[in-house]
């Protein structure tokens, strides 16, 4: 193995570059609601006293609370419960092994006693830091503000009684707009004067006090492939804790299912379940009527291709910036992601690492870097880290770094990246424009998607990981797209393979479970209000005004007061919130801008807004400005280069809304008049008689009022499998002849366990002249050296090695249609002598396309047989609703049950006397269960 010059120049040991966390230094003059508190671990499972679990699960890591709350904890003042958020994080153990975590954060109201104490502290601060005139003005504004809010609640209560579209309705809406403007003005005036909790407003303030603290529930494990599964499972188990905040959940019943205490779900996942064993088994877990399926990729698939999300990164950055970022990662730069949304950092870091396949990022990898570890940015080694925009003191390195602003689609770097060879870069861009046309041809705007901003966008249990809720596993397409010629790379998917997005997992679960009735639309319990303001200033675009007037009175009548506020006035509502770190936006009562969530009706390809939350039609980017600390604007900001200069044959189709067509998040919704039988995929209600919208791509239906809630991209507008194929094809062209230079090892190398010795100089000399400089750069990277080392140490038929070799063979076969797509020359020789061309592997089942390499097209191991984990059920002490809606700080052991056996898992071989098979118990099943 060739030593990495870049790695030897920089330190690479995790513990040598990651400093201990800085302590919290609290200013004694700081206002109580600006003060940050250090998070602590309240409880864990298995408990700390279960020392016998350490050998199997490993030592519980330090600093987990700091990664769950990377910016520590603040008390938030808000009328409504702040929005639930989620994020993933990666920790490195003492032995340099990785631990992966997913956490979901919900907000709990401070009880009256604690809230009173906080108010006393606020009053003391006001007495010592504000003049008497300021306090009087603040008190006066507070009284007037409370009066206007009460007036607003009275006006909102009248809305259901007045027909939509009538003159009286128009006058009432104008009056509501005026009151909201007054509230906005007074709130802005009050913010610099009064720093404290405003008094509770009856009918508008949820909770006992209007003061909220965050609480995190999370999972730790060693398998990154399970992170998306853990996220959806966590969303499911916290749904009852929102006490109706997640809408359109069918009510509990014996036929549908009943919620169980949190403790039983924890035992179900951590003790009764096991990790999926390759592609032969998928593990089914249940939460009420939901069924979730954990599965792994097959040996002949790209690792992470079924679990790692790419859309969030591609929605945030232009294709030009994506390729530039890929070039920086290939050169092992110090890459820093910046975003206002913690989960966006997690999604972007994992997506970038996944695109490097077959190379593996081997240096520091911290998708969410806590604020008290910011000094790690000075680490003298390559890294991929993510930092939140709201951190107080962000000090970037002096040089040699790349700052990627995910919210503004900019890359700020101290040097140009080492560019890919010209032809390889041009080809990669061409394929990406076909694989990811969501911005060029489907009008998707730039910025984080809704599911990267909060746990339940638009108060719905939607999911970007729809395959996790379907027992039928999507087909593998890697063989197809690495074998496909460039001209056929954009061919449409067969209609039966286009799976619609899942906007309500609970409703779909009811259909999948064989119920004959259509999904119910009733709310679960008391409806929690919708809020556009969260601790990280989350706000979605307003609800669109539909091109054709549609009656929404039925929806209004069914809604509660708080739902009316959100349903009629969009997401940009004004709420009373803590004035610290929360952006205020004017309310949009009657939006008249022709744009929707995830869509801008631009006629210029280059005029893509960089602010996904406030994009408008027209030229240029909105919400300008730079990073905010005086950094120079990026020279790699989103490209204005027309796609046709790279792929001349590609047809650019700017989109626009018409009277009968609406574009939302890549969906092309066409109006179907007089349709009263179709069911809206978003709210699960029937069409309202005059018609309904239908997407031409994925065939989903939507009411006009629901269009703005279509938060998931249309599968016709974004193709993650083709994107992965485009990147791996690029690397296959760069490493096309590498195996030719794996020769016999020396005696010393053999003694070290090497099966081959790589001739690096010979490999570089064999490359075309325009690739020499790039190959010389790769020679210095740890990623490439570990790629070669793996192939020196492992046989060619090892599945992890063979996947990429088969992709290279597919590249050879693309240019020569008669070429056998076997692994090497040996397979050709064997075929000429009548031997199997599959090298000892079974031929693919039903593979009729000779262009697809035999091994990549082999689906004989693509079984994913379901092993069902027993569903948590049974009676429990206490009042049902009180138990299932609580947000416990500690697990109640009395609510747990003894673990049960698993049905349908592969039989464990006997270990004792011949023929004696031990009964399976949870402690025997699987590898490294989550904590």
From Swiss-Prot:
* InterPro entries listed in its UniProt record: C1-like_sf (IPR046349), cDENN_dom (IPR001194), dDENN_dom (IPR005112), DENN_C (IPR043153), DENN_Domain_GEFs (IPR051696), PE/DAG-bd (IPR002219), Tripartite_DENN (IPR037516), uDENN_dom (IPR005113)
The keyword Nucleotidyltransferase appears for this protein: no
User: Where in the sequence does UniProt note compositional bias of the Basic and acidic residues kind?
Assistant: 566-575
Report the stretches of sequence that form zinc fingers (Phorbol-ester/DAG-type): 666-714
One GO cellular component term of this record is:
extracellular region
- Compositional bias, Polar residues, is annotated for 521-537
Per the database record, which ranges form the cDENN domain? Answer: 301-433
The secretion signal range is none
User: Which residue ranges does the record annotate as region Disordered?
Assistant: 13-32, 478-552, 566-586
Please state where this protein is localized.
Secreted; Host cell
This protein's UniProt keywords: Metal-binding, Secreted, Virulence, Zinc, Zinc-finger
Give every dDENN domain span.
435-799
Which purpose does this protein serve, as stated in its record? Acts as an elicitor that triggers cell death and defense responses in the host plants.
For this chain, the family text in UniProt reads: Belongs to the EPD1 elicitor family.
Protein known as:
Elicitor of plant defense protein 1
Question: Gene encoding this polypeptide?
Answer: EPD1
